[in-house]
Amino acid sequence: MMLTRRAALLGLAGAATIGASRAPADPDVVVIGAGSAGIAAALTARAAGLDVMVLEAMDRIGGRAFTDTATFGSPFDVGCAWLHKADDNPYTDYARAEGFTLQAHEYDLERVWLGPEPTPAHLVNEAEAAMSETITDAPADVAASTIVDLSSPVDEAAGDYLGALDMAVDLDELSTFDYANADDLAPNLLCAQGYGSIVVHRGRGLPVRLNTPARGVRWDGPGATVETDAGSIRARAVIVTASTGVLASGALRFTPDLPVATREAIADIPMGMLAKIPLKIRDQRFGLEPFTDVLLARRGRRDLYFLSFPFATDLMVGFVGGDLGWELSAAGEAAAVDFATQGLVEMFGSNAAGAVVKGGLTPWASNPWTRGAYAAASPGRYGAREALSRPVGDRIFFAGEALAGGLIQTCGGAFRSGEAAAAAVRAVLT
């Protein structure tokens, strides 16, 4: 597995200040999950004077914001990488104030191959812009594939870049309303030290119990009881930041069952897949400048995107999404690295394979505490996001990237959702 124990040092360093004595035995609020939404919820609730305990199933904080600093000899964001909508992102000013290095980077394609043939990148960029407008203007919430023309290689490439490689689902699984109601995420920033490092830094010192998955939530009496392998915790309210994939799996039981509308909403916002295949390159740059955006487009939804050598590191970071992302995640690291390496060969010739000295595959599909990359509403089910955001019995509150309004599928949006959930809890409890 590409992710090493040393890679989690930043997360554990943040947790090193945590002691059982610092977390109240029966807090006002239990927050389930110490990702971006959970960190924001805990910070906001504590600022409101509420006692908080955070339960985290993994051995680190940060959730899907995780920077691996060991595997490749330079920071690699296993999950969240771009600070989207940077002028309104809750991490931007914080990162600058704390000395993180930020670099503007939009992801307009600069180099494109349609199969083995180099193609002017502007053709795909223009086709994607036109397709985006068509989907945004859709009068009904339907699958995006039903209203766009994908007959030409350029249009198919644009559709894959817009759908699988951005929204984490192919166009036949993309809700037009879900897409239309997502914000324009420009401007975008990347962080030299890793976005995950920023998130962990912001969450340092919170009362988090690591390696403590919540197994159940009982809400059949006053307040709620959260059940863990180490015992039960009574609280006046619970903020649940687990992904919709985890919620749908039944790994977190609710007693009594959640209302039908809530359960249906969870099912209607399934997890999509965007997997990264980082390749470490030796003594070669393929004529690419750092941060160059490259797309190898193949017919049949087999597209591969690369972010080239960010911050002048030795990494070509490959991305695959949608059904292909799930397929390669199931096939495993060796198959994924071979797929990405062969992509380099198609674009740059047979010698490219010899330049690859190490590769990896991000684990979000197989991680039982994520079960996907980020959530995408099913066609016709855009309203499920609002339905899931409603509190249950004024005791159970949901938060996360799936409930981030216009900032769905983003780390900054998850933070805003956590803040909102904590504010709603405060309104009920105080």
Pin down the residues of each PLM region.
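FAD-dinucleotide binding site
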Residues: 9-430
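N-terminal secretory signal peptides
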Residues: 1-3, 14
